[in-house]
Amino acid sequence: MHKKKTEEMEADHQEFNRLIRENQAILYDFIKCRILDKSLAQDVLQETLYIAYKKWDQLKEHPNQTGFLIETARYKIQDFNKKT
C-alpha cells in the first residue's frame, strides 16, 4: 500500500513538472505583457506556480489546465496592481 502511494505521488510530481515545463513560457509572456519589470514579473510567475502547486488536486483534473494557470496569473497580476 505504501509503495502504491509513493508511486502515485511520483506520478503526480512528474505530471506537475510536465505541465509547468509546457506552460511556463506562455505564463511568463502573459505576465510580462502586463508587468513590464522583469523581476516583478518573475515574482508574479513564482506566486502563480506556487498556487498551482497548492491546488494541484484541483488542477490535475481540470479540463483546461493552461486556462487555469492563466486565470491564476491574471488574479495575481490584479493583486500586484492593487498593491502598487
What are these regions (language model features)?
Residues 9, 49-64, 83-84:
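Sigma70-family region 2
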Residues 74-84:
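Arg/Lys-rich amphipathic alpha helix in sigma70-family domain 2
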Residues 2-3, 77:
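Short, low-complexity, intrinsically disordered N-terminal modules
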Residues 29, 43-50, 63-75:
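Structural recognition of an alpha-helix C-terminal capping motif at a helix-to-coil junction
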Residues 18, 30-32, 52-55, 70, ...:
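Intrinsically disordered, low-complexity regions enriched in small/polar residues
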Residues 3-29, 33, 42:
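A short, charge-rich alpha-helical start-of-domain segment used by transcription regulators
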